[in-house]
Amino acid sequence: AIEEGVVDLEKDTFYDSGSVIVSGARIGCWKAGGHGHQTFLQVLESSCNPGVVKLGNLLGKERLFSYLDLFGFGSKTGIDLNGESKGIIFPLDRVGELELATTAFGQGVSVTPIQQVTAVSAVVNGGSLYKPYIVKSFLEPETNSVIKSYDKTFVRNTISKETSDKMKYALESVV
């Protein structure tokens, strides 16, 4: 939403009453009665599901799902481990209002831990997504010489450096 310019985390606001109704389903905030009036930075800080649903709606399903794809969700990372799963992402043609809402705050998808780490790493390193590796290199135990090594493998850009900087600030603010 930041990359697309549909929200300013510090200027745009949201009122959290404690829940939002989406397609007849009530999506609640973890805080009974809600958080009240907050900036979208505060929405992230407080992990407010209704506020993130609003962000998902501002972005729209096509753009949200294009970013899921861009960050590698729904496909294998190519990590050097056997049995990697691609996770589970709704097909775009089956995404309605409720699927958009739950996907926006992370409960409408199933991702692997390595996909999550790879995506968060891209967010905080300037937007560059790299192929993950378990081992950087193998060394011969007696001489300590490199037997095999893996170079950093750039995959693609995901977000701008400016958005990355804003997200680093937001993620630090969450902590």
Please give the residue ranges for each predicted region.
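Beta-lactam-recognizing serine transpeptidase/beta-lactamase-like catalytic domain environment
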Residues: 2-175
